[in-house]
Every structure is written in structure tokens, then in C-alpha cells.
Amino acid sequence: MKIVIINGSARKGNVLTAINAFAKGAAGDNDIEIIQPDKLHIAPCKGCGACQCYKGCVDQDDTNDTIDRIAAADMILFATPVYWWGMSAQLKQVIDKCYCRGMQLKGKKTGVIVVGGSPVENIQYELIRKQFECMADYLSWDMLFQKAYYATAKDDLAKDTTALEKLESLGRAVNN
């Protein structure tokens, strides 16, 4: 199975730790690719609608290549820190640009990992969860999981062996 992980964090901290734990569990026979939006040149969506006429974004940047890679996946894992009660701008920008070929994302297996600086009962996680549920409903995604983690210091998640084991287990579960 082809798994594309979109890392919405520009930092090498807790979100990357979560991604690596999931990827370790999913390794097996899966082809895993991590997309790092902060390393790409992707202009914000202008809402021009030209993509609907030209079968892709008309911006001369990394959008179409990135969307091709996402569309080719059997599973998409969205991973993000919480920024101001929502997903990171880096992840949101990639999601916004998926509009140009959104129907190619129908029926995908998906998962969501969110790491924030507040306890997981905080409303910020619920807001992000609900947004992904709406996307999943619209695009008929098979949402395999949504996991939220509370971590403030750079290595908090790396010290949480229970969370790391659960993330590896989630990775192994996608092989079934």
C-alpha cells in the first residue's frame, strides 16, 4: 500500500516523533512517503476556479506535483501541530490546493495525528477533529483514526512510551 504522510509541522519535534512512530509500525510492505509542505513552494489558493477548466492548479509551483503524489496514495496521514485552535497553515495550504483535484481523493483511507500544547480535552482538538470529519464525509474517506496528543516540550512525545507504542500499533493496523 502507498501511504503518504503530510507533515504539517516545520519543526523537528513532537509531530515528527508521532509520524516516525506510525511509520515504524506501518513499514512492512508499505511504500511510505513523507511530504514536508514547509520545504515546498506552494502558493495559497486564490479561488480562481481555473483548476476546474485545466485539470489542475494553474500556479507554476509545487502544487500539481504534490497533489499527484497525494492522489496516488492508498492512504493519507495528516499530521499537524495545533496553531491557534486549528491545523497549521502549512497543512491547510496543501489541503486547500487539493481542491483542484479533490475528487481524485475520494475513498482514500485516512488518519489524523494532532499534537498540541493543551490537554487533549481542550476544544482546539475537537475543532480540528470536526474539520477532518467533514472532509472525510464529503470525500467518502475511510477515516481509520484520529489521535490527539498533549506535548509542550520538544521531546515530550518521545518520552511517552505508551503513546509511541499506540502509534506503532496504528501503523501496523493499516497492514491488515
Residue positions per predicted region:
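N-terminal beta1-alpha1-beta2 submodule of the flavodoxin-like/Rossmannoid cofactor-binding fold
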Residues: M1-A79, W85-R101, F145-K147, L157-N176
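Acidic, low-complexity intrinsically disordered regions
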Residues: T80-P81, D137
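Short glycine-rich anion-binding loops that position phosphate/pyrophosphate groups of nucleotides
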Residues: V82-W84, G117-S118
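Short, glycine-/small-residue-rich phosphate/pyrophosphate-handling segment
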Residues: K106-Q146
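A short acidic, helix-capping loop that chelates divalent metal ions and anchors anionic groups
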Residues: V115-V120, A151-L157
